[in-house]
């Protein structure tokens, strides 16, 4: 056998062995509680190495150092900016014989490219170690037929509102250690001095049952389930990632956890850390459990993203009581090894949450994990139009890699009374799509041209693509607080002052409500400002200005 042939055979054998190791890799053994180990995050791939990635989705570092998301479409890598609408228990999953093809076609018609779909642990593991993906696969197939991606919103807990089933008290994961009429795999809570240790009693009283994540019967099963989920969809072109839990943590409604299993974990934590503060125990335990869970997922799939969210963003906002109760905060996303900050933006706590997240991540949103992709920006009943627009603007100006809108039940086509809300979403998604190349690749700050508006109270934020092309976002921050509708609706003419340090001809396109309302060719000289007038602007508008 000649040397060339020998080398070829060795390469083939090596690759074949690597392929086998990938195909038959096993999940690592669970670590003892609070054992230090470096967690596994999603791989970040340099753009030049993208074609070597054995996946259908990946986090990619661009030459400008920004981390972006890309997906493989028909064998070709493409930029992907997440524009998601969430659906699940409180709209489509409560309906009999939901036609997901129709649901996803409707989302696509509105301009979404992703469906965030609620999926329960019991949907894919209906009995212990018996995995069944028939429901999940049918959802994925329908989304694929309609040209949508799927991000799973993976529920672990139960809720009175038929989560995960019509009889949530029968959820098998809460009955792995039943003794003395109590469920030991569930957090025990107190309300008004009364202890609840049984899932039926908790549900009857309206409390949300949550697992003891460190219980030996729960801990390894969550890891196993996440690993299996990751392996099942690793090479699927429709599934782009998963949100690990929906509003999980220690109970945020009541005092917890009075389960003796958790008491033993607390004692173990004290022995291993020489600390005693119970709120600190909750924080460090949550961080460690989520590190182990995310690592298990990435053992199964090193590339697709895993996110998380916290109830109403109250913990991200730094509410002391919520932080102490739940063991979560703005830092949870980094300390818990999440790839994505999947926060929520609603009127109640949204702005304080932004401040809390900025304090923790302001210099790293774009350059290291976790990146920002809010999971729920409320629309319809959950945010007024101006609040919705402003939360989108705050997401864009931080150069996030997408967002999710909550929820489909507020915008679906067959409910004509929701027409105004639906059109609100359509217009916003259209504005974004028309400028998506700058938004996806762009970083905060102006490019070759910077813009200013002289009128008091106007915010101008910039994104730039490689220091050249610019997208300016113009809005009135105070509009969300104004109750005088006539003041808000009064039409204004804004004078947009443009300046560059690079003399040349620029094309300026101005967008509002999903349409280009003005297009100009602007000749700029270095250091000399020129203005463009923008007519017909309301205080609750958001204006997109692209300069190329």
What kind of feature is each model-predicted range?
Residues 11-21:
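Bacterial N-terminal signal peptides
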Residues 291-305, 327-410:
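Catalytic-core region of carbohydrate-active enzymes that cleave or remodel glycosidic bonds
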Residues 99-184, 189, 286-300:
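Aromatic-lined substrate-binding rim segments of carbohydrate-active enzymes
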Residues 93-109, 316-333, 384-392:
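Short, acidic/polar
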Residues 27-112:
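N-terminal carbohydrate-binding accessory modules
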Residues 178-348:
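Polysaccharide-binding and catalytic clefts of secreted carbohydrate-active enzymes
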Residues 35-37, 46, 393-494, 502-506, ...:
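Aromatic- and carboxylate-lined catalytic core of secreted/periplasmic carbohydrate-active enzymes
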Residues 518, 523-548:
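C-terminal beta-strand-rich structural cap/linker in extracellular carbohydrate-active enzymes
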């Amino acid at each position: 056998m000649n040397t060339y042939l020998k080398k070829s055979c060795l390469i083939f054998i090596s690759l074949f062995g690597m392929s086998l190791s990938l195909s038959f890799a096993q999940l690592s053994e669970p670590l003892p509680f609070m054992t230090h180990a470096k967690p596994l995050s999603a791989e970040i791939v340099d753009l030049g190495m993208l074609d070597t990635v054995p996946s259908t989705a990946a986090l990619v570092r661009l030459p400008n150092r920004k981390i972006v998301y890309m997906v493989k479409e028909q064998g070709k890598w493409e930029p992907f900016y997440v524009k998601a609408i969430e659906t699940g228990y409180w709209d489509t999953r409560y309906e009999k014989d939901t036609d997901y093809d129709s649901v996803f076609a409707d989302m696509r018609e509105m301009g979404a490219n992703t469906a965030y779909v609620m999926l329960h642990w019991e949907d894919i593991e209906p009995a212990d170690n018996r995995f069944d993906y028939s429901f999940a696969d049918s959802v994925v197939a329908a989304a694929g037929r309609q040209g949508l991606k799927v991000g799973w919103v993976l529920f672990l807990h139960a809720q009175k509102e038929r989560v995960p089933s019509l009889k949530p008290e029968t959820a098998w994961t809460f009955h792995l250690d039943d003794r003395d009429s109590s469920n030991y795999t569930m957090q025990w809570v107190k309300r008004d001095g009364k202890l609840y240790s049984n899932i039926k009693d908790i549900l009857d009283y309206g409390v949300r049952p949550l697992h003891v994540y460190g219980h030996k019967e729960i801990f390894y099963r969550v890891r196993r389930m996440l690993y299996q989920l990751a392996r099942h969809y690793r090479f699927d072109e429709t599934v782009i990632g998963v949100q690990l839990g929906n509003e999980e943590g220690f109970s945020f409604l009541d005092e917890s956890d009075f389960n003796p299993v958790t008491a033993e974990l607390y004692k173990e934590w004290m022995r291993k850390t020489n600390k005693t503060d119970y709120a600190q125990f909750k924080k460090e335990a949550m961080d460690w459990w989520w590190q182990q869970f995310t690592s298990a997922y990435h053992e199964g799939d090193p590339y697709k993203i895993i996110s998380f969210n916290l109830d109403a963003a109250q913990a991200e906002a730094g509410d002391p009581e919520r932080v102490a109760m739940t063991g979560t905060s703005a830092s949870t996303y980094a300390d818990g090894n999440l790839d994505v900050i999947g926060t929520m933006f609603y009127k109640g706590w949204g702005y304080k949450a932004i401040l809390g997240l900025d304090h923790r991540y302001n210099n790293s949103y774009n350059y290291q994990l976790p990146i920002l992709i809010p999971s729920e920006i409320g629309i319809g009943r959950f945010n007024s139009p101006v609040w919705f627009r402003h939360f989108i603007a705050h997401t864009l100006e931080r150069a996030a890699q997408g967002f999710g809108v909550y929820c489909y039940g507020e915008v679906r086509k067959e409910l004509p009374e929701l027409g105004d809300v639906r059109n609100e979403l359509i217009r916003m998604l259209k504005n974004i799509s028309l400028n998506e190349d700058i938004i996806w690749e762009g970083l905060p700050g102006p490019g070759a041209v910077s813009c200013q508006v002289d009128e008091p109270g106007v915010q101008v934020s910039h994104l730039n693509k490689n220091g050249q092309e610019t997208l300016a976002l113009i809005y009135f921050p105070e509009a969300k607080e104004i109750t005088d509708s006539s003041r808000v609706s009064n039409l204004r003419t804004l004078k947009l002052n443009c300046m560059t340090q690079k003399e040349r001809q620029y094309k300026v396109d101005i967008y509002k409500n999903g349409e280009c309302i003005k297009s100009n060719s602007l000749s700029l000289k270095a250091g000399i400002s020129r203005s463009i007038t923008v007519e017909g602007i309301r205080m609750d508008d958001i204006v997109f200005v692209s300069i190329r």
